[in-house]
Amino acid sequence: MTIQDRAHLYNNSDFGQQFPDSRFMVSDRWISATWITGNNYKSLSSRSEDDKPFYGSYPPGWLKRMWTMFPDAKRILHLFSGSLSAADAKPPHAHEFALRLDIRAELKPDIVCDAENFAASVKAYAPFDLMPSDPPYSVEDAEHYSTALCNKRKVLDQCHQTLRKGGLLLWMDQSIPMYSKKHWKWVGSISMYRSTNHRIRGVMFFEKV
């Protein structure tokens, strides 16, 4: 399935029909869209003890929209999964597994591991079809998580080792990570807006070459 096919899946989905301004623009080179998810202060990853949003978690509705584009994804790895629950990590379609990886054991991910060196820890599950990834964007963000800011070049190298050829890395960030054109093809982007006083995030679609 091409990236253009995936854009058309979203455009023809309930989300694309209900929110026509969110549909992808499609060209031979890539796809692009703007998504405004609205004023919902409860993020998908939330602390069960007090129901307050977990700092930096996925924007509301992000995964539900994203799943419409990947009905064929069987092996999924959520990098920097935070407090994403096992139930929310799973797509609505038939799949083999949807694993959560995070360095913080207290958040109870499926795999406790440093994202800069995770390839060996997921060897039994690789290669993956899809990797949604939401890393800390800055030193300040990393301090909120009580972790060090990751080396994004090293993380992308680990992703390249464990994705199948043609597999997709969905990298959510406030800047474009350094990447090698020998290893990755940048095939799409989404500009993500929530509401006032929320940061703007981008989602970069990188296809493994």
Give each language-model segment a name.
Residues 174-209:
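Class I S-adenosyl-L-methionine
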Residues 113-133:
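A short acidic, Gly/Pro-enriched loop at the edge of an enzyme's catalytic core
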Residues 166-174:
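Conserved beta-strand signature within the Rossmann-like core of class I S-adenosyl-L-methionine
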Residues 94-96, 163-167:
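A short helix->loop->beta-strand "cap" motif at the edges of active sites that frequently abuts
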Residues 81-117:
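Class I SAM-dependent methyltransferase SAM/SAH-binding core
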Residues 146-165:
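A short glycine-rich, Lys/Arg-flanked "PGG" loop and its adjoining helix->strand segment in the class I
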Residues 129-149:
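A short SAM/SAH-binding and catalytic strip from SAM-dependent methyltransferases
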Residues 1-93, 198-200:
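S-adenosyl-L-methionine
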